[in-house]
Structure formats: structure tokens, C-alpha cells
Amino acid sequence: MNLPKTGFPMRAGLSKSEPKRLKDWQDNKVYEQVLKKNEGHKKFVLHDGPPYANGPIHIGHAMNKISKDMINRYWMMQGYEVPYVPGWDCHGQPIEHKVEEKLGTEKFNQTSTAKIRELCNKFAVENIELQKAGFRRLGVLGDWDNPYLTLYHQHDAADIEVFKAMFDKAMIYRGHKPVHWCKHCHTALAEAEIEYSDETSPSIFVRFEMTSKPAGLENFDGPVDFIIWTTTPWTIPSDQAVSLKPGAAYVAVEHEGRAEVMLEDLAPKCCEEFGWEYTPVMVDGKPYVVPAETFHHIHYKQPIFDGVEGVALLADYVGVDDGTGIVHNSPGHGVDDYFACLKEGITDICMPVDDDGKFYTGEEFGTGGPFSGMDTDEANPHIIEFLRERGTLVLEKKITHSYPHCWRCKHPVLFRATDQWFVSMDKTGLREQAGKEVRENVKWYPAHAANRIGAMVEQRPDWCISRQRNWGVPIPSYTCADCGEKVMNDATLDAVIKLFHEKGSDAWFTDAPESYLGEACVCPKCGGHHLKADKDILDVWWDSGVSWKAVCEYRPELEYPADVYLEGSDQHRGWFQSSLLTSVGANGHAPYKAVVSQGFTLDGQGRKMSKSLGNVIDPNKVCDEMGADIIRLWVASVDTSSDVSIDHEILARTSDAYRRFRNTLRFLLSELEGQFEPETDGVAFADLLPLDKLMVARLTQVQAEVDDAYASYEFPRAYRALYDFVVTELSNVYLDALKDRLYCDKPGSLERRSAQTVLAELFSMLMRDLQPILSYTVDEAMAYAPAGCVDHQKYAALLDWYKSPITVDEANEFEGVLEASLELRSAVTKALEDARSVGTFTKSQQVRVKAVVPAEMYALLTGDKAVDLAEFYIVSDVELTQGEELSVAIEAAEGECCDRCWNYRTTVGEYNGHAHICKRCADAL
């Protein structure tokens, strides 16, 4: 008997074997070998979105990096030169916050900027090494010894090169407008740095008394009020206007001698909530209902500061579903308010809150007045009580609503009008061009992601790119010490670029401007030569967003635009967008040809992972206990285009799937290792047995599906095609049917060599199709494989992509025979199960099948591509006749049971010395 035999272990022992294999890859520079093998070929560049250098890797990191590695390994096998340069995002408030925690706030505030930056640098580098080890352990190939870091000198310089390119196009300007402000971190924030979560806030309705009466109410005896609604009482001290909905109808409701103006559609609901009777003011016998325009430019008393007046405006953003249909405007604390007031010529913007979120001290408008020195949150109840005492508070209640929070410290943020640097979205057409790139020149996976980022670009405000922190790349602006003029021009920018290339951005905080500006150290306004370097730094999204310049353009092994970016879906408003805007702004086109976005990792119940819930899956721990290939297989199996779930139960199921793949590879090796070499023992396709031709046709179809799935970044489609093929078609059907030939035929016979040829094709295909997923396991199998099955290579990463001996079109010609054979097999299997259940037969080889099949099926099953059905169904004989409908009958097979192959044959006992075996087995012996 040709019993299966291989040295490839049944038990994987991944947690112990993988680290040894990883060391071998590193010692023998496998990544460099792959680059060398494909050197000079067309390049494929997946540009790595830099993870933040803050703490060990988590399961989201693992999904991200493994996905990238699967893509890269696929294109490597396709013959492309695939340089992969991993990177890290090193600047920003989170690292600075960690340093502040370590030093303590008091000591931190006393520490020099240069020292803080030194400590931040140290923290980032230490965490990079921690994360790098985690990523390498996952089996990710790349230039790990030469990654890109956003703290490198050339990256600092690239920041300013892109800044200059956009500054020269008048895309960058300095302005005074409301921006998200974190009073805890003392810095402006961009929209991408904002997270929304539920917050309970005071909800108040307040009357603002008009100083003149609107048309139609001139004869009303009592005061006339606007009733406004707000959830931020702390903004009322800076109120400068109220806004009504253009074209909407407003009604005046009479209450205790006052006319209270509200949106007509909301007034009945409001009156009920206030405990008022809904009694409209009557004018000429009719309820006083007028359009919003009636109140345009009507003035009212500022509710906090006596002698100060506000004005009524019209604004489209006013909602008509909640509140009163009238909102108060504090242009220093809201973007909509700011633009509504600006449109009406209100340019003297009130901003009574300092960097710490506290009201300035003073008594006049523009300070905190009665609330001087109070934090905005602290002031809320005091302001409410103040309004109550004045008799202007109509109603107070609590409301839970979505509110913006700082992405790092998690504290609620506020809007503050401050002097900041902005990228204009419209002045030079950046919004339009970026939107065009999204729609026309970039492929998005999934396709609907184009709509998401397109809408974000369409709706986003100007980009606030300045931050008031220490750890980042400085905005290259100066202030003249003599006249206060801001100084920035091509000469100063070129000098800064040169400085950063040579010394990095730390030099901004240590070197005097005159030491490197030379003749550029002059104020164009007053001619003074005393320039002071400003302290604002660039938004970290700018910093990472120019990596296309600092990495893809600067590094000769890469290309710009990159072939693909892949990150989480949150990067539509983060790195995808900052990269898009800087690249389009500087060069007029997107930095990527395709973008793949992924969802978030959740637990098995669809919840976010947190230590408090005890549902965190640590990839390092999984590697130590189960192996990295289990995580890799999980990543391949789930649809990462949306949120995905992972827990210990899911990983256990993944381990079961892993065993299916491993056992299949092991079975194939057990019939090939030391027994078969395709280059000397292989059988040409034309000479294969019919069943083997059928399997080659089927593997060709599966291979085409897997190829298309990988090329389309649809990993679960590749996984599902392979899993179903291995489990349903190979293990349960073909390999089972083949065992008779493999075990019992002569070792060198055509029948056995035909079977082994197909096993070699299957092995070659699976090794390549699984290599991007089960990188460690496939590499392990290389040592046991026939050399011709693995391109005579030692490492799996060096394999070329599988090429079937026939085309897909040729394979499709076998589809009818396969479908007919499988349809009849189902009927035969049921008949066998029925017979077993009543004890008629115990083994399928005891059976002879008599089947009646329709004409079309009969033609397929007896035609030139027909297979040996007895072998396929593992029975001793199959007799086919043509009829109207499919039916199957089984009976006892003719002859006797061969003791060697267990088939029933009439030739058993015909050969001397072999009384109990059939002719085929006697010949084999």
C-alpha cells in the first residue's frame, strides 16, 4: 500500500514555531530577497498610514497591518516590485499629554519648550520600538529597519515645502474666527480631532426684550420679546444677535401683558411646556402671524449687560423642529453664528473667554461681567440664576445630546474665536478640485466611501491648521518686534526649509532667526530686523498628511501617487482627507490611485472594547497563545469594509478553520513529499484521467475567483472561495475519491501519477493563495514540498503567483459535467444513507449503483469529458440508463471484496498467491 507519509507536523505549535521562523526571515533578509527578485519590474506602492506612537499595538492595529501585508504579498507574487515602508505619527498633543502626566502639570509648565520636545521625542521612539516588535511578530514584511517617522528632519522640511507651495497659491491665510478649542489641552482642534459623545447640558428658554416694536405691534401696550432657546447658557454673556428662519411664519403669544415671539409651528408646544395658555396677540381681529423678515434688524436688550443691544438677523441654519425657532448668536463661540453676523456687517466679535476656558475679568461687555474668572461650566448655573432673578428665564430643564469632545483628553470642547492659520477651501478652488479628484480619479473600496469623503470635502469649513502646543512642526511665521507685523514670504520659507533639512524643527525653538534667515530677516512693513519666531505648530493631520511628499516623493524606492492607501473609515475625515487636501493644494491631484477603508474592531456582541468590560483582545497575547496565523486568518475571513467582531469564541472557530487548511496541505504533502516531482513525474493535462481533468478545471475556476478577490481587496471573498473549495469539494469529495488510486495503484502508474499531478497543482495553488493569509504556515510547508511546486525557492514570500495549466474558458467547458456528476452524487449519497440506516450495506464499496438520468444529464455523464463515476462516488460500479427523471437504485456489487482495496471485483482470487485480491492490486504487488 502507498500509505501517506510526510514530515509536515499535524500539530502546528504556532506560538513556538513562528518566532523561530520570524528570526530566520530577519536573519536571511527575506524582505530584501523579494525586492531583489522583482527588481526593475513595475512597482506597486501601498503607502502606510502612520499609526500613533503611543502604547502597544491593539487588535485594530493588527487588522490594519495584516490587511496591508496580504495586499503586498499578493502583488509580490504577481511579480511587482513592492517596497513597503512602515511609518509612525510622532507629533501631537497625546504624546505631549503623556509627558505632562509624567512630570506633573506644575513642573510641565515650568519646563522649557526644548526640554518638553526632547522628552516627547524619547517617548515616541520608545513606543515605536514596542509597536514595531508587535507588527513584525504578526508576520508583516517591510523595511522595518528604515521606517519613516514624522519627527525626521526631512519630514519636518517636507511640511514646510508643502506649506510654501500652498501659501504661494494664496491657499493659506491667518484669520480670526471660531474654532474648536480644548480648554484642558489649551489648543485649537480641527474637525478630525473631535469625537462626539452624549453630554447632559442645561436647556434654557430666555426672553430677549426688544427695544423697538416690529411692524404690526406698534400699538401693543406691553413689552415685546424674542423667546430664544440654548443649551449653552455660558455663551449668553457674549450674545450679539438673534437669528430667525428666513420665510418662516412667527407668532406673538400674549402672556402676562407681554408679547412673546416664537415660530408659529412650535408655539403651541412651547406654551404647553412653559405652562402658558396659547393665546396669540390679536391685531385687527386676527392672530399676529408674520414672516421672519418682519423682525429683521429689530434691536433688543443684551440680557446680561445693561445698555448693550443686539440685533435680529435671518439665517438658514435655524432649526424648525426644536426650541422656539429663534436662536441667540455669539459669533465668538460658533461658526454658524460667526458667518451670520459677518454677513450682516458685525465684525467686532466678542470673545470674553480665555485659553483656560475662563471669563476675562471686567465689568464691560466683552468680559465676564458678573461671572468674571469663572470657568464656562462653572458659570452655567450662575448665569441661569442671574436670568431667573432678572425675570428673563422662561424655563430651565436638562437635555442629553451629542456634544463635541477632544479626541485625546476626552473633555468637552468649546468654540472660541482666536487668531489662527487656515487653509482656504474656496478662495483658489481647493474644494472643487479635491471633490473632482474624489469623484473621477480615485477608486474607492468600498465604492460608497467616495460619497462619504466627497460629502465631507463638500461641507467642511476652512481647515484650521495651527495649534498652540509644543510638540509638533512650527508654523513658519515671525512677528516683527518693532511693529508687530506678521512676517512670512518665500525667502523666509526657503530659509526654514533649509534649516529643517539640516537640523530639524527643534532648531526653530533654539536658534535665533537672524542666525539662519540672513538677508530675509527683515520686516517688509517697517524695515526692522528684529523678528521673533512664533510659537504655533502645525496640526498633526497636516504633519501626517504630507507623508506623500516626505516619503513617497523623497524615497527613491517609492512612487507618488501611491497605488493604494488603506486605513480605518475614520480616516475619511483624517489622514485620507489631509493627504488629499495637501496633495491637491500643492500639486493639483490626489496622492493615491485607490483607497481602501475598513471598519472598527468590536467584541462578539458588537460592543467597543474596553478594559472595564473585560472584552479586549490583545494581539500580542493571541500570538503567544495561538499564533499570528490565527489572527491573520481571522482578518482574511471577515468583511473589514464594515465593523467586525472578535472574541475568544470567534478565534476558536478560526482555529478550526485553520486546522482544515493545515490538514489539507498535510494530506497533499503526504502524497507528494519524496514521491513526486512535477518536472519529472508530472502528466500533461491532455493525458490526465477524466476525474483529474475535472479537478484541474475546478481549481482553475477557484483560482480565478481568488485572484480577482485579492486584486479587488476583497479578502473575505478569497477566504470563502478557498475555504469552501477545501472543505466542501476537496476534503469531502475529490480527495476522498482519489484515495483508492493513491493508496492502491502502482507507484509509477499513469493512474497514480495523474492523481499526483493534480495534487501537485492543488498544492501549488493553495500555497500561493494562502501565502498572503497563512504566511507562517505556508512558509513552514516549503521545507516538505517538491521543489517544482515551489519554484525551487526556500521561502514562501519568494513564490510567483499560481498559473493553471488551462485557461478559465477551457475550464468552463467542464462545468456541465461537474454539475451533472455532483447532482447524481447527491442522489447516490442519499440512497446509500438510506441503505445504511436499515443495515443493508455497511460500506459504499459493497454497492453497485443503477441510475436513470434525463437525456441531457446522460449526454454529459457519458460524453468525452465524463468521469469514472464509480471512483467518484466510491462504489464498486455505476450503471447509467437514460430516462425521463433522475432515480437511483442500489444493489449488491458483483464479485468479491478485495482485501487490499476493499472494492468488489469479479477478478478477486484469479491470481496465484493472491487468493483474496483483485487484478489491479495483484499487478501493483
What are these regions, as identified by a protein language model?
Residues V179, Y403, S477, A520, ...:
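Residues immediately within or flanking Cys/His clusters that coordinate Zn2+
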